[in-house]
Amino acid sequence: MMARRDPKSWAKRLVRAQTLQKQRRAPVGPRAPPPDEEDPRLKCKNCGAFGHTARSTRCPMKCWKAALVPATLGKKEGKENLKPWKPRVEANPGPLNKDKGEKEERPRQQDPQRKALLHMFSGKPPEKPLPNGKGSTESSDHLRVASGPMPVHTTSKRPRVDPVLADRSAAEMSGRGSVLASLSPLRKASLSSSSSLGPKERQTGAAADIPQPAVRHQGREPLLVVKPTHSRPEGGCREVPQAASKTHGLLQAARPQAQDKRPAVTSQPCPPAATHSLGLGSNLSFGPGAKRPAQAPIQACLNFPKKPRLGPFQIPESAIQGGELGAPENLQPPPAATELGPSTSPQMGRRTPAQVPSVDRQPPHSTPCLPTAQACTMSHHSAASHDGAQPLRVLFRRLENGRWSSSLLAAPSFHSPEKPGAFLAQSPHVSEKSEAPCVRVPPSVLYEDLQVSSSSEDSDSDLE
């Protein structure tokens, strides 16, 4: 009988029995879902996703074929551009595009304003715009700037200048013009004086190392210029008065008449290098600068003795026989006038080229033997160009404060030579020992007196 039983049926019975036993042993509760279904309460430890465990075949860490890109839960149209490489072409443009097209078609409102502003800066009158407004856009197309701000509308009138400022500026311009006009004669005179040095520059040997100063010349009177040099020649001074008397006589014969009125030229304090022409009766006082000038020496034609000290200033009759000297404007004698009183030589003249080497072409001049003062007779032009004029004589005097003052002495030929007392009465400081022969002295006596240095007082004490 056992053989008659089918093994298949026996197996079926066994499976049923096992299933029944499992059903009995199962706890009472919710049934677990099948393995293919997702449970959102589960979380995979490998990938961190919900719906499966680490042992599930849905985990992408174990089965790469099942790893899919997570899709979005829901699509929302209009949030993102699925094809950004293709620009969106809209059949109906929006309101912004419509406004932009209208602005390009119609003329711009700010074009007339820009044109008016352009005409205001250029100075041209603005043109009247056409009624339709199309003519203004054609001429100002090059001025359009898409990103530029609109200009402020202004009128084409230029700003008016304040009358107070205009009057002040006019006054300043007139003041400058008067200053230039006052300086122009001096500049012209400097050119004329430099060009007139030709006739006399070859006749004289004594010259200075400084440039020719600007001289103002009026009329036919000879010009007086003081020429300082570095040193004095140490040759004898007895030969100079003889040549001076000859020159003085020739000048008197060539110029029989002299002008009574001579223009007075204002003089200002200046260094010895710059001197101006002097009129009759004018005084020139100048002081040395704070520093020693490099090329401002003092010209001394003769040797001056240091000792003995001369008395009051006097001019002998022999020095003014050529004519009566003009009355100069006397200076107040300083306390040291008795010790430093200058003296004049009886004869005036010029040096010959053999006595003094010519360094620079300058007008002729000569000075007598004076310890602290000198008289200089000079003429820039020839005798033919100054008929009726006499050479003038400049007298330099040293003051107490270290400055020098100069007075102008004239010697016209039409006066009688028997009246020298007129000048002597007006100038009481004339040396009585002016006819004394000159003595050789060091060439730096007058040069040191005209310089400002700490040893000026010591030199005065040594001379005393």
Swiss-Prot record:
Top-level taxon of origin: Eukaryota
Pfam hit, one: zf-CCHC_6
Biased composition (Low complexity): 180-197
Compositional bias ranges of the Basic and acidic residues kind: 74-89, 97-114
Leader sequence residues: none
Region Disordered: start-end pairs: 1-42, 70-389, 415-437
Family membership: Belongs to the FAM90 family.
Protein name: Protein FAM90A16
